């Protein structure tokens, strides 16, 4: 016998493109009604990706939108109570919800998190997984409590990390996985078949918030570490270096595998340009050579090194040192 599920009244809390994808799927692929959206996203944010922004989705679908940095916690509490919400769904929201809000919805609050908890609790799980060379990550859906990402796990789905994944590409993969998992989890919550699994406290790591300073490339690190960070910080804050008073952003790089585990470049200062080539700029690091392939001069568009060198070859002379 086929069960007929009743649609829920949902309040959605989310800010990023990652959140927007989940919101889009909830609206267009479920029977549930999004009655209010709360976001930290500025209305001035321009569309920079193929994924609709939170604001655009709310406008197209005529859903109440609240920019929560203009509201106090008590005001948010009041709004949620008056809207008769069944469940709150939180995806990459950026602010901790108060204890009172967590207890208002009949079915509580659930959070979609971009890692296999308890690994990478915190605000930057996708970036930190890439930075640390993880080969596997995933999506966790948890029942929220008063602490950060510590609630019982309702659902988890693993996802392989490709050697070429950036935060942008991995976020897109996880958004696809997470949105499907979210629909399944809501159905289980309605049916009362969801199992709450406490997190394993023996494997906790924390994904600290990103900042622009850490995007400054430290050439004393190994080529492997630098390449990971370049992928982790794409599309924000974007790794960068300085040469001849020019700030250069690095969007893509490769490791020269032949240079790993060799000491033949120990006499060179890390950051020294070994050579330039149509396929990239070869730079000596604390261990190994990294090949910079896609760069962006300040105020210009990102471009492959092969094309960049036609206009800026004087910037990247052999044995110049990047800082």
Curated annotation (Swiss-Prot):
CDD domains: FMT_core_Met-tRNA-FMT_N, Met_tRNA_FMT_C. SUPFAM superfamilies: FMT C-terminal domain-like, Formyltransferase. Pfam families: Formyl_trans_C, Formyl_trans_N. It comes from the Bacteria. It catalyses: L-methionyl-tRNA(fMet) + (6R)-10-formyltetrahydrofolate = N-formyl-L-methionyl-tRNA(fMet) + (6S)-5,6,7,8-tetrahydrofolate + H(+). GO terms for molecular function: methionyl-tRNA formyltransferase activity. Gene3D superfamilies: 3.40.50.12230. Its EC number is 2.1.2.9. PANTHER family: METHIONYL-TRNA FORMYLTRANSFERASE (PTHR11138), METHIONYL-TRNA FORMYLTRANSFERASE, MITOCHONDRIAL (PTHR11138:SF5). Belongs to the Fmt family. This is Methionyl-tRNA formyltransferase. It comes from Blochmanniella floridana.
């Amino acid at each position: 016998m086929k069960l007929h599920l009743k649609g829920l009244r949902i309040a959605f809390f989310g800010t990023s493109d990652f959140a927007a994808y989940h919101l889009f799927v909830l609206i267009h692929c479920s029977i549930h009604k999004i009655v209010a959206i709360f976001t930290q996203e500025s209305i001035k944010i321009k569309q920079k990706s193929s994924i609709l922004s939170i604001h655009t989705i709310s406008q197209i679908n005529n859903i109440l939108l609240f920019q929560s940095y203009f509201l106090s916690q008590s005001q948010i509490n009041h709004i949620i109570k008056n809207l008769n919400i069944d469940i709150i769904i939180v995806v990459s929201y950026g602010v901790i919800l108060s204890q009172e809000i967590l207890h208002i919805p009949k079915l509580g609050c659930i959070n979609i998190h971009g890692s296999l908890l308890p690994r990478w609790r915190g605000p930057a799980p996708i970036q930190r997984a890439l930075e640390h060379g993880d080969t596997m990550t995933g999506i966790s859906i948890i029942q929220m409590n008063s602490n950060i990402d510590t609630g019982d796990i309702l659902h988890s789905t693993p996802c392989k990390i490709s050697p070429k994944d950036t935060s942008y590409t991995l976020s897109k993969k996880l958004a696809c996985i997470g949105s499907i998992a979210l629909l399944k989890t809501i159905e289980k919550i309605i049916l009362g078949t969801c199992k709450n699994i406490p997190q394993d406290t023996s494997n906790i790591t924390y994904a600290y918030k990103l900042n622009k300073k850490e995007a400054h490339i430290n050439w004393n690190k190994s080529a492997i570490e630098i390449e990971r960070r370049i992928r982790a910080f794409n599309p924000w804050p974007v790794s960068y270096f300085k040469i001849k008073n020019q700030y250069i952003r690095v969007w893509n790089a490769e490791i020269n595998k032949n240079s790993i585990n060799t000491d033949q470049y120990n006499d060179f200062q890390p950051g020294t340009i070994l050579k330039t080539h149509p396929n990239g700029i070869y730079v000596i690091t604390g261990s190994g050579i990294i090949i910079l392939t896609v760069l962006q001069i300040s105020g210009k568009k990102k471009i492959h090194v092969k094309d960049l060198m036609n206009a800026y070859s004087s910037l990247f002379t052999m044995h110049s040192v990047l800082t």
